[in-house]
Amino acid sequence: MSRILKPVAAQDVKYLHQICAQYFMGERAFRIAEYNLGNTFTGSIDLLASDDTTVYLITINIADFADALLRAFTGYRWFRENRDFLQRIYPPEVIDIGLQVQLIILSQDFPPEIPSIVDEVCSVPVGLYRYRLFGSAQDPDIFIEEIQRPGKTLPFQDEEPDTLRTRLGIEAANLSDDDIREFLSAMRA
């Protein structure tokens, strides 16, 4: 018997920010320095994060993608204009504001042409991540995957279902090989 996970809508924006931050800390080893930096008029950043080489300005879309794209760009402009000020506020051991910058946009849906557009138009790297919320609206679970650019290989593309079960720690779910393949293809669609 397969367990059906039903998509749910985000009810609590702060909670969505927290679970996205947990993903980036756990899966990408980012350090989160700040939540909700800036404001809607001059530019805002949902999550200010970094690793050893890059500062990430993360925008989490809960509505229209065009609005999220504009928020990401105005947040980047605000960050650039206030970089000296931010370096005085945040000590380097918390976040090194002088590192290279990458924008990250999380969204449930993307226009199909957006990866090639941001690659061609933007002077700063832009990472695109799709997220899905499952479970209940009061306590959702999240699935996040990076949108692959042409020429990149998809994660788990060539792995056998048994290898994936072990790697993802889902042996106890008793999912069949077909269930795993179906889920992966649905998430990539």
Which residues are covered by each model-predicted region?
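Charged, terminal alpha-helix-loop-beta segments
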Residues: 1-189
